[in-house]
């Protein structure tokens, strides 16, 4: 296999480390996630990473501020600010502030009713700003909620959207048939007609039961359906550091692609770095 630089399309960095259902919540456990990830970058030849802001829980409410402090110190990171869809802050004013801090996009979580309502309430002038400035929009959502994006993209087809974790189609304890895979992926796959929509092949541990079921064969049919619709040029590997480390070793987050028979070496090089580096203006 040829040697090439990797680029990670989905990591998190939290002050005091990730406090979800993780070993880092245990008393006395303290991890410097920045130093930890930088050591992984060196060991596994990672050139750049998209840092996905998340401030939707009390323990990480100041995550945007933490990332803003890191941006000038970490040239390898491209940070996306977490946008609370129910915030009272003027959105254009907020976007300009984030741009001044060095963010290159926004991170949206669209699951609950209020979040769906917040998405529907975004005005055209905001989408225009995001479109004209070429900002990346990382979205965590699932199922039929992906259909919410079609009317938005029809009006703003140059929005640069990246769907996280294969669009979170389901949690698989068995391998679905091809027909089942096609049906469950149809809301996301409807967005393939918009050329700036990308899909992150990330968070596989969250899609299989058990989570440590490497190489996650139960997800292969939905992965292949995504490949057939979007092509390898619009797929992005994301490790989902550091939550992934509760279930997998770091290299397992990308080694699974070498197990999937429908990816060739050229596909893997694009997915593991080339595509993201082009998106963020780095060398492919």
Each PLM stretch: what is its role?
Residues 117-236:
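Catalytic pocket-lining loop regions of alpha/beta-barrel enzymes
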Residues 10, 41, 67, 98, ...:
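Conserved, mostly hydrophobic/aromatic
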Residues 25-52, 57-72, 96-97:
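Alpha-helical scaffold segments that flank or form the walls of functional sites
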Residues 1-9, 22-48, 224-225, 229-236, ...:
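Mid-to-C-terminal alpha-helical segments outside catalytic/metal-binding sites
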Residues 14-30, 172-174:
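Acidic/histidine-rich helix-loop elements
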């Amino acid at each position: 296999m040829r040697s090439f630089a990797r680029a990670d399309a989905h990591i998190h960095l939290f002050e005091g480390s990730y406090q979800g259902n993780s070993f880092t919540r245990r008393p006395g456990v303290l991890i410097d996630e920045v130093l930890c990830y930088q050591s992984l970058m060196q060991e596994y030849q990672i050139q750049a990473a998209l840092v996905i802001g998340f401030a939707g829980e009390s323990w990480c409410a100041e995550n945007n501020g933490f990332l803003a402090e890191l941006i000038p110190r970490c040239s390898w990171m491209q940070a996306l600010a977490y946008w609370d869809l129910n915030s009272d802050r003027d959105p254009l004013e907020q976007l300009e502030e984030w741009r001044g801090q060095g963010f290159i996009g926004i991170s949206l979580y669209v699951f609950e009713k209020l979040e769906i309502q917040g998405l529907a309430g975004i005005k055209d002038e905001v989408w225009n700003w995001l479109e004209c400035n070429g900002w990346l929009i990382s979205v965590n959502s699932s199922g039929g909620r992906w259909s919410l994006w079609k009317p938005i993209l029809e009006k703003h087809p140059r929005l640069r959207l990246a769907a996280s974790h294969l669009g979170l189609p389901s949690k698989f304890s068995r391998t679905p048939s091809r027909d089942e895979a096609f049906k469950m992926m149809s809301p996301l796959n409807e967005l393939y007609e918009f050329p700036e929509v990308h899909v992150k092949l990330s968070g596989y541990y969250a899609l299989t039961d058990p989570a440590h079921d490497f190489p996650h064969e139960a997800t292969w049919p939905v992965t292949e359906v995504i490949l057939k619709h979007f092509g390898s040029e619009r797929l992005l590997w994301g490790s989902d550091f550091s939550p992934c480390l509760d279930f997998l070793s770091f290299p397992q987050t990308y080694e699974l692609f070498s197990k999937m028979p429908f990816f060739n070496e050229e596909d893997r090089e694009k997915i593991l770095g080339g595509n993201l580096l082009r998106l963020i203006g780095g060398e492919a």
